[in-house]
């Protein structure tokens, strides 16, 4: 099984890309307002898209597709959290609170 620490690493990379905005960065582009859409709309639309793809993969019994689309969905949720300034630790804390 993979190391769950990778979520923290990916989150930090996302935060860094939002802050430093390197040219050619997908995250930097996604989290920047443009002439047609505010960044929050672009991020939320990606979450909707990835959710739908995950649901279809699950419905089709596509195990690899579920893993792939889950990764895409989680990635975009991490982008949303970072964009909104929500630390991933806050989500972990909520999981711990609910576990009790």
Curated annotation (Swiss-Prot):
**Which biological process annotations from GO are given for this protein?**
L-histidine biosynthetic process
Keyword flag Transcription regulation: no
What pathway is this protein said to act in by its record? Amino-acid biosynthesis; L-histidine biosynthesis; L-histidine from 5-phospho-alpha-D-ribose 1-diphosphate: step 2/9
UniProt keyword annotations, A-Z: Amino-acid biosynthesis, ATP-binding, Cytoplasm, Histidine biosynthesis, Hydrolase, Nucleotide-binding
Q: Which GO terms describe its molecular function?
A: ATP binding; phosphoribosyl-ATP diphosphatase activity
InterPro entries linked? HisE, PRib-ATP_PPHydrolase-like
Q: What is its main location?
A: cytoplasm
Gene Ontology terms: cellular component: cytoplasm
Q: Which reactions is this enzyme annotated as catalysing?
A: 1-(5-phospho-beta-D-ribosyl)-ATP + H2O = 1-(5-phospho-beta-D-ribosyl)-5'-AMP + diphosphate + H(+)
UniProt xrefs under Pfam families: PRA-PH
Q: Its family? A: Belongs to the PRA-PH family.
Question: What NCBIfam families does the annotation carry?
Answer: histidine_hisI
Q: What is this protein called?
A: Phosphoribosyl-ATP pyrophosphatase
Organism expressing this protein natively: Methanopyrus kandleri (strain AV19 / DSM 6324 / JCM 9639 / NBRC 100938)
User: Which lineage?
Assistant: Archaea, Methanobacteriati, Methanobacteriota, Methanomada group, Methanopyri
Q: Which gene encodes it?
A: hisE
């Amino acid at each position: 099984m993979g190391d769950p620490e990778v979520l923290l690493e990916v989150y930090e990379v996302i935060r860094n890309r939002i802050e430093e905005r390197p040219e050619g960065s997908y995250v930097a582009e996604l989290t920047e307002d443009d002439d047609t859409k505010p960044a929050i709309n672009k991020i939320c639309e990606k979450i909707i898209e990835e959710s739908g793809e995950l649901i279809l993969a699950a419905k089709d019994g596509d195990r690899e597709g579920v893993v792939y689309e889950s990764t895409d969905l989680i990635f975009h949720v991490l982008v949303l959290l970072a964009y909104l300034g929500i630390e991933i630790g806050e989500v972990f804390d909520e999981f711990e609170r609910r576990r009790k």
